[in-house]
Amino acid sequence: MANNARLYLDKYFKIAKTDHRIFGSFIEHLGRAVYSGIYEPGHPQADAHGFRKDVMELIKELAVPIIRYPGGNFVSGYNWEDGIGPVEQRPTRLELAWRSIETNDFGLNEFMSWTQRVGAAPMLAINLGTRGIDAARNLIEYTNHPGGSYWSDLRKQHGYDEPYKIRTWCLGNEMDGPWQIGHKTAEEYGRLAAETAKAMRQVDPDIELVVCGSSHDQMPTFAEWEATVLSHTY
């Protein structure tokens, strides 16, 4: 005897409101994503800041609500300080995640200027691979503190008087993966994420922080990772 299934549709029935940020994206220093992707000084389609106008128009058309930066695996070996200040004074580094050379011509302030132009909210990722609490608290002081401290005053010296007031932050990237620079156990990552969050909120209590879940459901620590990390952070 065949079993018949019935499906009832009710377009007015709602369980909850969908967070529009689920339609967000991210940009990483990988391949041509940044250099010659969104940023290419001298290109016929580049504006005075080096941003590709044709790419910006496409992103505006997509109406991407939020964009994460600078990665991705890239963030786990990244020193955010390398990407601020006069471009000609920025260091060129060996980039270990994707085995390339990073010029740091495009950094934090360029990203913030670019997101403002495309109408997307920024989401900054914190390096919890090779760095941690100190670098994170300095970064949020640079971006979110009004002034009167070393890092906030340095932002002003770089030409950005008003704080960015970045609200959404990601604590690391795929930290469960052995491919990640500074790969950690769930216990190690959970404790570091919790302490980093604590320090960042002392600088700005209004921020929203996101921890890393499992990279995919085939990871040997899948589900156990989430339970352990959240036991420290939630």
List where the protein language model places each region.
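Non-catalytic accessory regions flanking glycosidase/transglycosidase catalytic cores in CAZymes
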Residues: 1-234
